């Protein structure tokens, strides 16, 4: 069987890390898979979710340290495993892994630095938007779209309007990229200017912007309308996403948008900023609504329009079918395995 090593800096809760676990759990059915985590940031829940057939190795490096021991560990394990392919998921890792197997790299966002791209046998973009960005940097890449565990997501059974419009935003609380402040600003317009009182937002996630975002909520006196639920397991999200009336992804920068695809599978309407990554997920507007990026009033008007118009059941079913057909994790994992074989056949 093919021996594959996935190499990543950390395994904390996030879109990249969570999806990597899902990919590995599919790939172990067809290959001998190892995961090497460089830093000491490891989420126990993600480790528990990994298939036992995956060989997990942690270098326990402290972020920022110059201690060479973790690098020695990394290369000791690589020479012991003798992988056929090394799949890298973080900038800088390719140049410190010395084993002479072909290395490939997944570009997860539209602000990756291309300084080490030449070291890889292949580059993979998670969306056409990221592929275009990478092409603009002078490098070609193959699109392998992100995937989700579609069978695990509970589906919304009743799309009738609830008394209070319940909105959810899921993701790392880092507003310069994820744009949560735009949603809070839009809530200020809706609640305090437009007097739309029967509306609420739940933020699910953790991150460095938490205090800033809480401060904005207090500034606009939105405490009765906005909640921060903290980080939650994937099971919690997949079980509860269907209870919401709308998912909003207000990103200022986004390579793909996993939570948007998850909401589509759950039968929940989606509203996204018109950045290329999220627009790609909703079929350029065919399977969801969008608003002008970094524009709270555009977002507020879009929310109000959705609240007024209600749900289009036919469109929601089409969106769900589209997401299931295009974003199933099994397809993502199989595509990568096929790519590995292609590269090995060329070597």
Where is each model-derived feature located?
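Conserved acidic donor-binding segment of nucleotide-sugar-dependent glycosyltransferases
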Residues: 284-296, 305-310
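Aromatic "clamp/platform" in nucleotide-sugar-dependent glycosyltransferases that forms part
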Residues: 252
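Nucleotide-activated donor-binding/catalytic signature segment of Leloir-type glycosyltransferases, i.e.
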Residues: 214-232
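A conserved mid-protein helix/loop that constitutes part of the nucleotide-sugar donor-binding site
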Residues: 14-22, 165, 174-192, 208-214
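Carbohydrate-associated surface elements
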Residues: 129, 147
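Short alpha-helical donor nucleotide-sugar binding micro-motif in glycosyltransferases
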Residues: 78, 231-232, 239-244
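Short hydrophobic beta-strand element within catalytic cores of glycosyltransferases
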Residues: 269-272
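N-terminal strand-loop element at the rim of the active site
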Residues: 6-69, 207-210, 274
